[in-house]
Amino acid sequence: MTIARLQRSVTLADVLVHEAGHAVAAWELGVRIGAIHVHMRVREGRVTFASDVGLGRFPAGSDALRLAIEREMVVLHAGLVAQKRFHYEGACGLVPRTDYEGILATALQVETDLRLIDEWSDYAEERARALIELPQTWRRVEALAVELARRPVLHGKEVDAFLAGVRVPRTANARLAYRRREAKERYCLSHNPEDREPVERAIAAARRTR
């Protein structure tokens, strides 16, 4: 579960992109989505997903368990990463407390050294950045943000069906999502305020047609 409670400088579009970032990352990584809820008037959003961690699905201490935890950490980071990609100035200094609490609680299932958890979280954040930077991922984030303006409550199967139907650009190398250093260096350079305008207009139009 992830909640974004946002400050005055953050727009409704920022909230929608934040939640879309969580959901698209989950969809891309095979983490099952429960539902997305966006409360328009208070600019608050929530994504729930069906965690595979802690259910006894993986042997304790196994590599499979650590990979499942890491996937969920990437999903939890992806909301703020997408928001910064969309509107960097509006996200500066923002701390989505519930996202970070979720990251810590998830990692604590296999690791108790907080220093190592911080390093692991940094790595998961880099993976989230690289994933969100992929053209096809970002196109899905934009499309889902606009759809959430029309339908602020979407359940997992609806999200799956919608994202599967989004037309996305082809990418030459899907492994780009895991090129950590290049993604980190490129991250702040990729933000262009003009990229925000078409999405904000589409969100405004979608709200008028509700």
Outline where the language-model segments fall:
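Soluble catalytic regions of large protease machineries
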Residues: T2-R210
